[in-house]
Amino acid sequence: MKRFFLALLIFSLGNSLVEASDPAEDALRERMIKAGLLPGYLQAASIPSGIDLLPPPPAEGSAAAARDREGNERILASADSSRQQQAKIDAATVFPGVTHSFACALGIEIGDATTPALYRLLRRSLADFGLSTRPVKQKYMRPRPFLVNGKPPCTPNEIETLRNDGSYPSGHSAYGFGWGLILASVAPDRTDAVMRRGIDFGDSRQVCNVHWPSDVEQGRVLAAAVFARLQAEAEFRSDVETARKEVAAARASGASTPANCPR
């Protein structure tokens, strides 16, 4: 996760940083490009400040912290095997796979071959939503649930990375909710389904035992702020309109429902 955000930061700062980067950063950039990441729409200075917008995470010993503990215990106890499996799937942020469950909510395939404009819109906006959480994470470095409750996360291979990456707020929640907002703009009649998927995407991080409830809630707040700020970008508005027409045309032509969707 830390490397993921570093790659987003490199992209957001543009080629001037890349030209001055060391070989390790160049290699990281190449891997992230292969994963399908693209530079966002917003310059780093234009991304809403989570430090100004969000309250600090709940203080240890506070009633809010107790609610987070209770919420964490409740969701871990209630998640069945199918929900746990979906949470593992949602943990991966590699394109094109990360868009599949959102395609199920939208009702048509999302991909470079089927809906290239929408696919690019999601790839670019992920950087804006994801980067918005980074300064807050770095400021507070809130310990993740698995470090507190002693229960393993759903992705044990990421323990060492997540151990050194702040829990508050959730980046997954930010871009999951943000994608829900974008997809609702692209296909308004699918608003309920795509927003539910965006919410569930963030909730998967609670099922994975890597985020507290308040991490996920505040990730959504930050996503809403980023989405509002994106409306001021002509390129973003144009891309949303292009994606809207593309999706409408695909649906009118009888585009098939994605395969292997959760039931």
Identify the residue ranges that each predicted region occupies.
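Non-catalytic nucleic-acid-binding interfaces of large nucleic-acid enzymes and RNP effectors
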Residues: L17-E19
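Interfacial helix-loop-helix junctions of multi-pass membrane proteins
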Residues: D200-Q231
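Short, mixed-charge aromatic SLiMs
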Residues: N157-E158, D200-H211, R244-S256
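Catalytic tyrosine of NAD(P)H-dependent dehydrogenase/reductases that use a Tyr as the general acid/base
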Residues: A7, Y168, H211
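Hydrophobic alpha-helical bundle signature of multipass membrane enzymes
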Residues: S21-V207, A232, D239
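Bacterial N-terminal signal peptides
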Residues: L6-N15
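Acidic, carboxylate-rich catalytic segments that either coordinate divalent cations
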Residues: A24, Q231-R263
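Positively charged n-region of N-terminal signal peptides that target proteins for export
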Residues: M1-R3, D215
